[in-house]
Design a protein with these regions (language model features):
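Long, histidine/aromatic-enriched segments associated with O2/redox biology
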Residues: 1-180
Length: 180
């Protein structure tokens, strides 16, 4: 084993920036719709693509910002996790970059993340489950500023990805069929 990272729950599902993470996650049956490949791709139906990343946060620099500045970077209120109104939410806010509508529908992923930390560094371990890697790839491109619109996610000025991988997770039905 080259690396072992331990995540933990922090306060009321907040990450180490102090914001609640996963506020916009799909609920109920919408979770499966976002995360599981459907019958339109029968050989892979019931499976999911999983993208994982470990971010290191510059928390010392982040904590020098006041709450209002942090809220402008995230696009939500720190206390109640309420999305800022469009007229005051910057286009470079994290929420502005990752909430994407295509053909009148919001691209969905199911996200799960945990804060992690050592004596020397700390950040967020992130996993996205999705029926289409295109949604995750576009969110990531918009965060990193590679979509050609001249914008990037300001949160990336305080956070850097140090690891990342993408996997396909087959359905239990597919795995069971391998035994036969």
């Amino acid at each position: 084993m080259a690396e072992e990272i331990h995540g933990f729950r922090y306060r009321d599902s907040r990450d180490l920036t102090g914001f609640i993470d996963g506020t916009e996650n799909p609920k109920g049956k919408a979770r499966a719709v976002a995360a599981l490949i459907g019958e339109e791709d029968r050989p892979f139906a019931g499976g999911s693509y999983v993208a994982v990343q470990r971010y290191v946060n510059d928390l010392e620099r982040w904590r020098r910002l006041d709450d209002r500045e942090q809220e402008q970077i995230i696009g939500r209120t720190k206390r109640g996790s309420v999305e800022l109104p469009k007229k005051i939410k910057p286009q470079t806010a994290h929420i502005s970059r990752v909430v994407i509508e295509q053909d009148g529908a919001e691209l969905q992923i199911l996200r799960q993340s945990y804060p992690w930390g050592t004596v020397c560094e700390a950040g967020l371990y992130f996993a996205a489950y999705t029926k289409s890697l295109d949604a995750f790839d576009l969110m990531l491109a918009r965060m990193m500023g590679t979509t050609g619109d001249g914008l990037h996610d300001r949160l990336m000025e305080f956070s850097r990805a140090v690891t990342g991988a993408t996997f396909f997770m087959p359905s239990l039905e597919s795995i069971s069929s391998l035994k036969q």
